[in-house]
Amino acid sequence: MERRELCASLLAGGAAGMSVDLILFPLDTIKTRLQSPLGFSKSGGFRGIYAGVPSTAVGSFPNAAAFFVTYESAKRFLGSDSSYLSPIIHMAAAFLGELVACLIRVPSEVIKQRAQVSPSSTTYQMLSVTLREEGIKGLYRGYKSTVLREIPFSLVQFPLWEFLKNLWSWKQGRAVDCWQSAVCGAFAGGFAAAVTTPLDVAKTRIMLAKAGSGVANGNVLFALHEIWRTQGIMGLFAGVIPRMTMISLGGFIFLGAYDKVRSSLL
């Protein structure tokens, strides 16, 4: 990838990611509290819906930038003229992008979610408590579950987004506009969000679990089994509506803004 393309992907991805995370933060807080083992009301209800936003503000730009730089680089490296291989290339690029991005995302996500369900505590207090009680390892609690959530999500979202853009482009006989890319992103994101909600619930429970508990060990299958045993199908899909709404809107803003900013920089 040329230096100009690299910079364009970095800036476009970072700007798009920060915009989405900050605009939709209240919906993310509501979703997290619905998924909390304490329940929605005890986790804060509708109070302090911006609790944990400093963690997001710090982590969202480098997280999204890392994903898109890796994603675009991998697409270029793995590029093929065969249309049949395109979905596989997009999946592989998304997989690599998530592995890199999660190294930045997880510490930010851990502190953010703990602050979201403890609105009386500040982000700095949550960071201090986590480091004091669990060390650096505590910041990466749920790394495996986050990767196991994000990779299936991206394997659905990004190939579907690229497919819808290509289909729309073929139908109208020209490249899609940025708003059309955004619409494709909304559909792709909403669908991917719905089918991966159980993994998102498991990830939230692992990150919020008390140190030393069975769920806190990071075993996703154990967490899913516990949720199913205690709450059934409703527990596995807790927060699915705000998650779908948030990610559909996020897909519209994020992928539309990414294409717009990147094209304007190239």
From Swiss-Prot:
It catalyses: S-adenosyl-L-homocysteine(out) + S-adenosyl-L-methionine(in) = S-adenosyl-L-homocysteine(in) + S-adenosyl-L-methionine(out). Keywords: Antiport, Membrane, Mitochondrion, Mitochondrion inner membrane, Repeat, S-adenosyl-L-methionine, Transmembrane, Transmembrane helix, Transport. GO terms for cellular component: mitochondrial inner membrane. GO terms for molecular function: S-adenosyl-L-methionine transmembrane transporter activity; S-adenosyl-L-methionine:S-adenosyl-L-homocysteine antiporter activity. Solcar repeats lie at residues 4-77, 85-167, 176-264. The keyword Transmembrane helix applies. One of its GO terms (biological process) is S-adenosyl-L-methionine transport. Pfam families: Mito_carr. This is Mitochondrial S-adenosylmethionine carrier protein. It comes from Xenopus laevis.
